[in-house]
């Protein structure tokens, strides 16, 4: 399907009526995203039964309010499983509301960092003040993205634009995440903040975000660990003058694209990762089976290490699909490895028959492809018509180093 939008600069400030900025001083940082007019909001959160105080606070605020103006986020501390954590979460929101001169119940919040450590609120609130001071800077979007980074190697930002009846609608986003990525967010350590200037109801925005999340963040795996803080927010302020009811398909497609791009940036930045892996499963009996099989591939530690070493051990792909729980017939399925950036493909298994073996050109080509930094795995189960794409990365020595020293 042809894309009905174009990529533009600006991230969360690309849509009309939004400002942002961030500030980080070594370990701790804070970011603000602000709508100059009233907006509706939607959010999805971690399903981890151990969840952070800002998750609990913002869930409640979203349920009980219909008007929102801002998002405030801090990095360096997760504000999870600590004494006085809810009071600290409320203080973070209060500081943002005071600076922006808006009610506290119009502010959504998020935190990321070390779990089980008391929030240094004197430092965090100072970072919020510093972020607020320069919300009109030309590079304010990148500042906000950098401010929420922890073990991230680079800021993650994207924006798109499409037209309806000669009016432009924009969607922009920033995200952070590199490790502890295996979200399962319903109704995403990984944070995603998205803005749009479309006019949309809270119910429709929530439904659109849930659909986009299922196709993007919930298909992303770095290490298989689900964070206590995973969160994605969308603010929509209606400044484009275009109603969602006039462009449902176009908006949902664009929102899913933004979400997928942010999810792919996150897995590309997996702690120590060098390669993006896209696993697409076709021909599944159900959508659930397609997701089970594709997620099983990108979760497999054996496969992650194989991609790190460019080892074309395709048997690990077959095994991952086989134990995923998806219906399959081992006598009739395909496995292909390809380079995302080109048309190179190596057929490893065809209709259940081994094609690639020691000394064959297919195995040699697979090894060459696995040296690239963007690799796709294609599996056709030949059981039905459903498909799913999951996103993952390789796993190397640097991941162990980063996580063995995280709190020291």
Swiss-Prot record:
Stated name of the protein: Glutamate N-acetyltransferase
Principal subcellular localisation of the protein: cytoplasm
Record-listed substrate binding positions: 150, 176, 189, 271, 403, 408
Keyword Kinase: no
NCBIfam families (alphabetical): ArgJ, PRK05388.1
InterPro entries xref list: Arg_biosynth_ArgJ, ArgJ-like_dom_sf, ArgJ_beta_C
Swiss-Prot/TrEMBL catalytic activity: N(2)-acetyl-L-ornithine + L-glutamate = N-acetyl-L-glutamate + L-ornithine
Subunit structure: Heterotetramer of two alpha and two beta chains.
Site description Involved in the stabilization of negative charge on the oxyanion by the formation of the oxyanion hole, residues in chain: 112-113
Origin superkingdom: Archaea
Chain's role: Catalyzes the transfer of the acetyl group from N(2)-acetylornithine to glutamate, forming N-acetylglutamate and L-ornithine.
Active site: 189
Family: Belongs to the ArgJ family.
EC number: 2.3.1.35
SUPFAM superfamilies, sorted: DmpA/ArgJ-like
Record GO biological process: L-arginine biosynthetic process; ornithine biosynthetic process
Gene name of this polypeptide: argJ
Pathway involvement of the protein, from the record: Amino-acid biosynthesis; L-arginine biosynthesis; L-ornithine and N-acetyl-L-glutamate from L-glutamate and N(2)-acetyl-L-ornithine (cyclic): step 1/1
